[in-house]
Amino acid sequence: MGVSAVLLPLYLLSGVTSGLAVPASRNQSSCDTVDQGYQCFSETSHLWGQYAPFFSLANESVISPEVPAGCRVTFAQVLSRHGARYPTDSKGKKYSALIEEIQQNATTFDGKYAFLKTYNYSLGADDLTPFGEQELVNSGIKFYQRYESLTRNIVPFIRSSGSSRVIASGKKFIEGFQSTKLKDPRAQPGQSSPKIDVVISEASSSNNTLDPGTCTVFEDSELADTVEANFTATFVPSIRQRLENDLSGVTLTDTEVTYLMDMCSFDTISTSTVDTKLSPFCDLFTHDEWINYDYLQSLKKYYGHGAGNPLGPTQGVGYANELIARLTHSPVHDDTSSNHTLDSSPATFPLNSTLYADFSHDNGIISILFALGLYNGTKPLSTTTVENITQTDGFSSAWTVPFASRLYVEMMQCQAEQEPLVRVLVNDRVVPLHGCPVDALGRCTRDSFVRGLSFARSGGDWAECFA
């Protein structure tokens, strides 16, 4: 893929909390690309948890993400999060009210706080930002180029969860995919453009493997909220005290401090200068504070939708069983979150394709990653102390579900192997498979991979959803 060096926070590799300086302004051609994603201001922007833009982890992959010599990909599937969005409507109202309150009560706006005096909250709500749209265009380009032996001759089957921003993401992916295909002189002529073939409702009563919501006990769980509150209390009070001292007259809650930190990402990705200018909200906090913020987001995902929640991985079981069906060209066997009407029809769940793309949200993807056992090597995350990426065995919210994240599942036929091999990449990082005899390149044979997904094939702990 011709990747270049990636500047990542040093703490991710060593736990050290100081790093290299990042220039105040970067040219888009060097810091925001199809191959590498968003490398602008990486010492800060890669610490935004799930609010980080997609950035490639190819150079963080111990195993090369390139297709091994002597192998050809015979099946490829991408599961993508939607692109960068504006704050949700409910959060946006809270952000706006907080800024207005600061403007009304602060008696001084000195130095790095000066922008707050006249800052006008005018961000949209819920939908993709223009930057987020381009992320998905780039994703479609990259998917086409990576799997061009397939994409030149095959129209992918595409599904989307029912949210407008997820559907829009799928359409932008198609735009990038098809524009690249039309420029490829070796592409098979006369093929139709891809389209979103299935949109799955996100109504609370609907079965939706891309965005499950019918497991009552899980939906009522407050575990992640408790973990979030407890870890917030370990690092935010000192920030709050500093902000209140610097903004005389202002009184903040710990939650409001994290809102100001959220604004660093949202204000940056909502502007046309996303590649050359970092939001002034970002400078209100230190590098160490961003490390804690990033870890806080990882805790929320791990204890909300991952293995830290007793029913977290079970929410991804339906999708795992759909993947098994696609890999083996056999009917879906699942009684959890799958939609039997859709999955039993070749029109809405074909079993004979070799190229698939699905679009969803971060929470559902986290559950799917754990249902597939990709982070079985991750021990329960400490709820009191920041752990680096080595200690978490490669898990963090920024490394798994940034905006426009992508999970690639590949099946390949290799000259030295009789059986097809399966491997998985998360944001260009090869994640060695668990639960099956894995080779030096992180792969298992298809049949052993399927056997290893016994948790998914047995329905996980779905019976506990309604206890």
Swiss-Prot record:
Keyword annotations for this protein, in alphabetical order, are: Disulfide bond, Glycoprotein, Hydrolase, Secreted, Signal
Expression induction per the record is: Expression is induced at low extracellular phosphate levels and the presence of phytate is not required to induce phyA expression.
Where is it located? Secreted
> What are the temperature characteristics of this protein's activity?
Optimum temperature is 55 to 60 degrees Celsius.
Q: Which SUPFAM superfamilies match?
A: Phosphoglycerate mutase-like
What pH-related activity note exists for this entry? Optimum pH is 2.0 to 2.5 and 5.0 to 5.5.
Stated family: Belongs to the histidine acid phosphatase family.
- Give the protein's function: Catalyzes the phosphate monoester hydrolysis of phytic acid (myo-inositol hexakisphosphate), which results in the stepwise formation of myo-inositol pentakis-, tetrakis-, tris-, bis-, and monophosphates, as well as the liberation of inorganic phosphate. Myo-inositol 2-monophosphate is the end product. Has a broad substrate specificity and is also able to dephosphorylate other classic acid phosphatase substrates such as p-nitrophenyl phosphate, phenyl phosphate, and fructose 1,6-bisphosphate.
The name on file for this protein is Phytase A
Origin organism is Aspergillus niger
- Identify the gene encoding this protein: phyA
